[in-house]
Amino acid sequence: SIQFPLLVKNLNIRNSNLVYEEDLPNGNKPGKLTFSQFNLNAQNLNSNKGFKNTVVQIKIHTHFMNVAPMKVNWSFDTANLQDNFTISGQINDLPAESINAFVTPYSHKKVEGNIHEVRFNFKGNRTEISGNYTMKHENVKVKVLDEKTKKEKKVLSAVTNLIVRTNSKSETENVVVHTTRNPTKSFFNLLWKGVEEGLKKTLVGKNVEKTEKTVKQVKQKLGLQDSVNQKEKPKKEKGFFKNLFKK
């Protein structure tokens, strides 16, 4: 059995595989983040009470989504009542398609293209995360999928890609990230939300909410037009309307 107070001065995990997944409320297949060739070194793992130095330092080297080299530096203080932490990292040579295993189940979108480099430097606590995010990318495009059929909505995809910055500038643009934690979710969900917001701001501009509102309005208009078109056809052939689509 584990005895307290607990202190592990040095912990190494080598050449392991780590999978993080979140269940969907509708019971569908969960999205997954995978980390292969996972190597971790943690120093000063402690249970807080009885120790002067309570800061934990963790270094990670792995392959994100099994393909992209990734390194992370993470530190936190077990004595801090707000669960303050800092975390920074870098991902290189990431095919955008590889993140669809996690993105698609939640957003009904697919991404394609090349993400050459991602850098993030965040700090946070039990309620929020914030910091800087930079990314170099090329030929990135988004496919919007129908929630039921999973087929691409080509018109909506085309509208979305008018907004997406397909290629990064010659000098990598830095965006500032700030997002809050879902209290029912883990630290890793909060970290992903920070990375996700950085991804959005890089691809569609810093005013993400305004851009998403614009796309939503276009989607509603397209949905209305589809509904009208479907109504007009029965009217001509049968002389009555049927509302086939719900929005």
Predicted ranges, named:
Residues 77, 90, 106-247:
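Extended terminal
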Residues 1-19, 89-124:
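Extended amphipathic, helix-rich lipid-handling scaffolds
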Residues 21, 68, 97, 128, ...:
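Residue-level signal for secondary-structure boundary sites
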Residues 1-87, 95:
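Elongated, acidic membrane-bridging lipid-handling scaffolds
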Residues 2, 20, 54-56, 69, ...:
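Generic, low-specificity signal for short hydrophobic/alpha-helical stretches with a mild N-terminal bias
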